[in-house]
């Protein structure tokens, strides 16, 4: 279900503060965040965020195509090792 337009996008307050500090200082360090549910805003374009996936912070550099999506979409939490193959097909 899509979020109501009148509510606006959800962004963690601390995330906005961290992004403003990074923009004003001009430093291009990775901004560590734990808020995977926050929406990517246009003012985040060009910044690099370290999005926590449960084990480590995955670096995500934000571009214009990511605006409107959530940070969690770009930091997978599960590793897929593939389905087990058919052993009969491998031998033949």
Swiss-Prot record:
One GO cellular component, as annotated: small ribosomal subunit
Gene Ontology BP terms: ribosomal small subunit assembly; translation
Record keyword Phosphoprotein present: no
Keyword entries, A-Z: Ribonucleoprotein, Ribosomal protein, RNA-binding, rRNA-binding
InterPro entries per record: Ribosomal_uS19, Ribosomal_uS19_bac-type, Ribosomal_uS19_CS, Ribosomal_uS19_SF
Molecular-function annotations in GO: rRNA binding; structural constituent of ribosome
Family matches, as Pfam families: Ribosomal_S19 (PF00203)
Entry keyword DNA repair: no
Function of the protein: Protein S19 forms a complex with S13 that binds strongly to the 16S ribosomal RNA.
NCBIfam families, per database record: rpsS_bact
HAMAP family: Ribosomal_uS19 (MF_00531)
Similarity remark: Belongs to the universal ribosomal protein uS19 family.
Protein name: Small ribosomal subunit protein uS19
Gene: rpsS
């Amino acid at each position: 279900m899509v979020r109501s337009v009148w509510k606006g996008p959800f962004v963690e307050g601390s995330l906005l503060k961290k992004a403003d500090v990074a923009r004003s200082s001009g430093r291009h360090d990775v901004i560590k965040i734990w808020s995977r549910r926050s929406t990517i805003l246009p003012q985040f374009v060009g910044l690099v965020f370290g999005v926590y996936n449960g084990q480590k912070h995955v670096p995500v550099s934000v571009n214009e195509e990511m605006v409107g999506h959530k940070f969690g979409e770009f930091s997978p939490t599960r590793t897929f090792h593939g389905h087990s193959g058919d052993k009969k097909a491998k031998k033949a």
